[in-house]
Amino acid sequence: ADKFSDIADRIGEALDFMEACGVDPQVLPQLQRTSFYTSHEALLLPYEQALTRRDSLTGDWYDCSAHMVWIGDRTRFENSAHIEFARGIGNPLGMKCGPSLETDALLKLLDTLNPAREPGRITLISRFGHNKVEDGLPRLVRAVKAEGHPVVWSCDPMHGNVVKSDSGYKTRP
């Protein structure tokens, strides 16, 4: 309760400061609403398909389960059902890229998922771990850049950095 009270007080102080500086929240629409985006792995295709809808104006298909869905390391291979599903929707897409991904395979997947090379469509999420990132990531970055694919690079520092306990549970430091 004390922590909440402290946070509420700090927010109040920030709002008072903004008012003192002449910032009026009633005039600035940016201070009246919040853009909120969600993302998750499109792992369970029956779930994703049940939440996929056709846009009535454009006829394009969108997965309404999230703003961006991503494809994981184990389902990210050419001709997989997951790639086929992702290819058919208009959502921004993420794709995990780790030590098992070869450059040729990545380039083929990018051609499949974003043949028009639309900027902002694909986010590549590195998941190498601290001990493999220097060997694996630069080759992928060079190949993608050389082919001119407009991707966003993102890092998932949790994946690839696991420690397995004696009981077999995976933990992350």
Regions from the PLM with identified roles:
Residues 1-129, 171-172:
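Active-site-facing alpha/beta catalytic cores
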